[in-house]
UniProtKB/Swiss-Prot annotation:
It catalyses: adenosine(2503) in 23S rRNA + 2 reduced [2Fe-2S]-[ferredoxin] + 2 S-adenosyl-L-methionine = 2-methyladenosine(2503) in 23S rRNA + 5'-deoxyadenosine + L-methionine + 2 oxidized [2Fe-2S]-[ferredoxin] + S-adenosyl-L-homocysteine; adenosine(37) in tRNA + 2 reduced [2Fe-2S]-[ferredoxin] + 2 S-adenosyl-L-methionine = 2-methyladenosine(37) in tRNA + 5'-deoxyadenosine + L-methionine + 2 oxidized [2Fe-2S]-[ferredoxin] + S-adenosyl-L-homocysteine. Its cofactor is [4Fe-4S] cluster. It is found in: Cytoplasm. Disulfide bonds join 122-359. This is Dual-specificity RNA methyltransferase RlmN.
Length: 388
């Protein structure tokens, strides 16, 4: 496995862009207040600007009419509000939207998933990923770099603006954010935590801590550190009932095995209010790899001391992967075993797979658009070759 990324990298906060200006999307509220103090202004000005930035998705200082013109002009000289731009949009038949978003000369993917009672945004934390999970398309890209705060919160800002942020109402349709896009969030704590702070801040997006979820594959020291930094909902990418299987499909397990990982999860739960006492277990269903009835019994025994709910995820294929999707009958049988043990078990409905926006598929189109044709063939779909 590739060397893990150092989570203690120098923070990108308050580093001017090439044009010499500070991108205010890089600053959480405390940092924003410090920025205004350094300008000789009152700290409450930071709250006013943040409200315009996040409640109304404004990137124009001239819109901020409750701020005097002298200060607006001063801000234009030293600061900017620059979110990453959408360079491609794809819409699924089920309403899911996937955006390819430019971050410098690279791209990450962000997915909007509407449901009857909520709208969830799946956000990326890195360009690529270092963890090399064998069933994940993003892992095939390898790791490139961590995203800045502005590139993480900027995905939420851009999506909110696109799907209906309006100054007239001050409402935003995005109700939940999940850090489940490209990358391992715990390997970019320096930037992920301030971005999540903005998501939670009343002058930011104002989301409940129960509606912001971080998903991790198990970087244990960083998980312990996270618990001292912020309280958000936690989901863990477990995907195996024992170390033998997990070593193979989630290589970080060789460094931090399941027992070590789950102990860290329980430590996090002891500190957290956001999780309401239990963690979400993510378990991708791989045909004849981790989906046997015996595996379900092993999983139940493994999790008996960890309060949790379990999401079973039908695997989404991509070219070159040596796996198949578990049949519905195998998934149902697996689920029944877990429910018989008393676990809340949900089979996740696949969303956006027709645009490669489903779990484990992000980065497919960015790497090679022709792979979408191959994926559809793997799923037995009819394709219009001229449209590819």
């Amino acid at each position: 496995m590739s060397e893990l990324v150092n989570t203690s990298e120098v923070a990108t906060v308050a580093v001017p862009n090439k044009n010499g200006k500070i991108n205010l999307l890089d600053l959480n509220r405390q940092q924003m207040r410090e920025f205004f103090l350094e300008m000789g202004e009152k700290p409450f000005r930071a709250d006013q600007v943040m409200k315009w930035m996040y409640h109304y998705c404004s990137d124009n200082f001239d819109d901020m009419t409750d701020i005097n013109k002298v200060l607006r002009n001063k801000l234009k000289d030293v600061a900017e509000i620059r979110a990453p731009e959408v360079v491609e949009e794809q819409r699924s038949a089920d309403g899911t939207i996937k955006w390819a978003i430019a971050v410098g000369d690279q791209r990450v993917e962000t997915v909007y998933i509407p449901e009857e009672d909520r709208a969830t945004l799946c956000v990326s934390s890195q360009v690529g990923c270092a963890l090399e999970c064998k069933f994940c398309s993003t892992a095939q890209q390898g790791f490139n770099r961590n995203l800045r705060v502005s590139e993480i919160i900027g995905q939420v800002w851009r999506a909110a603006k696109i799907v209906g942020a309006a100054k007239v109402t001050g409402t935003r349709p995005i109700t939940n954010v999940v850090m489940m896009g490209m990358g391992e969030p715990l390997l970019n704590l320096t930037n992920v935590v301030p971005a999540m702070e903005i998501m939670l801040d009343d002058f930011g997006f104002g989301l409940s801590k129960r509606r912001v979820t971080l998903s991790t594959s198990g970087v244990v020291p960083a998980l312990d550190k996270l618990g001292d930094m912020i309280d958000v909902a936690l989901a863990i990418s477990l995907h195996a009932p024992n170390d033998e299987i997990r070593d193979e499909i989630v290589p970080v397990n060789k460094k931090y095995n399941i027992e070590t990982f789950l102990a860290a999860v329980r430590r996090y739960l002891a500190k957290s209010n956001a999780n309401q006492g239990r963690v979400t277990i993510e378990y991708v269903m791989l045909d004849h790899v981790n989906d046997e009835t015996d595996h379900a019994h092993q999983l139940a025994e493994l999790l008996k001391d960890t309060p949790c709910k379990i999401n079973l995820i039908p695997w989404n294929p991509f070219p070159g992967a040596p796996y198949g999707r578990s049949s519905n009958s195998r998934i149902d049988r697996f689920s029944k075993v877990l429910m018989d043990y008393g676990f809340t078990t949900i089979v996740r409905k696949t969303r956006g797979d027709d645009i490669d926006a489903a779990c484990g598929q992000l980065a497919g189109d960015v790497i090679d658009r022709t792979k979408r044709t191959l994926r559809k063939r793997m799923q037995g779909e009819t394709i219009d070759v001229k449209a590819v």
